[in-house]
Amino acid sequence: MPQSLGNLFILAAPSGAGKSSLIKALLQNHDATEIHNNEMQVSVSHTTRAPRPGEIDGVHYHFVSRKVFQELITQDEFFEWAEVFGNYYGTSKVVIEQTLRKGIDVFLDIDWQGARQVKAQIPDTATIFVAPPSREELMRRLTERGQDTPEVIQDRMNKAVSEISHYHEFDYIVVNDDFTAALAELDAIVSSRRLRKEKQVMRHQSLFENLLASD
C-alpha cells in the first residue's frame, strides 16, 4: 500500500484484558465520539454474527450473511478474516486504505492471527498487545461479568492463554494493571508513531520547503 499520512494500529488482547475500554478512552481523550473523529477512528469490521442490543449496522459492525461474507473473501476484499466462536469477522481493505489516505489514524481490534495477516501486507502497521497483570486477575475479570457459565468462562480462559502465547510477535506491549497508566502508555505509542520522520515530512512538507528556500 502507498505511504499514507494516517497510521494503522492493531490492538490485540485476550478477553478480559481491557482492550476495548482502552481504545474507547483513548478516542474520548482526543475529543472523539465512541468510535471516530477527524484524527482517529476504530475500524468497523464485517461480521456474520447477529447484532447485540444497541449495536447499529455500519457503526459497530457491518452485519452480513455467511453467503455475503464468503463472496467478499472470494473477491479478496479483506486484509484479514477469521472465525471466532462460530462467527466470521473481517477487515475491509478499501475502507482502511481510504481512511489512512485522509490522514486519519485507524485502530484494528483483532486477534494475533489477524495481526499477523495485516502486518504481512502493511509492514508499517504498529501492533500492540494488551496484557492482564496476572492470570488470577484475568480469571476474576472473566468471572465478574456474571453472564457466562463456568464452562464458557473456562473456554475463554483457554483461548486467552493461547492468545497470550503470541505476545512476542507484537511491536509494543501494554500491561493493563492500572488503567490510567496503561492509557498513558497507549497514548505515548500513538504520539511516537505520529512524530516519526516519515509522517512529519509528509505533514509539514511545505514548511521545510519554505525554510530551505533561497532568499
UniProtKB/Swiss-Prot annotation:
It catalyses: GMP + ATP = GDP + ADP. Pfam families: Guanylate_kin. PROSITE patterns: GUANYLATE_KINASE_1 (PS00856), GUANYLATE_KINASE_2 (PS50052). Its main location: cytoplasm. Keywords: ATP-binding, Cytoplasm, Kinase, Nucleotide-binding, Transferase. Essential for recycling GMP and indirectly, cGMP. NCBIfam families: guanyl_kin. This is Guanylate kinase. It comes from Pseudoalteromonas atlantica (strain T6c / ATCC BAA-1087).
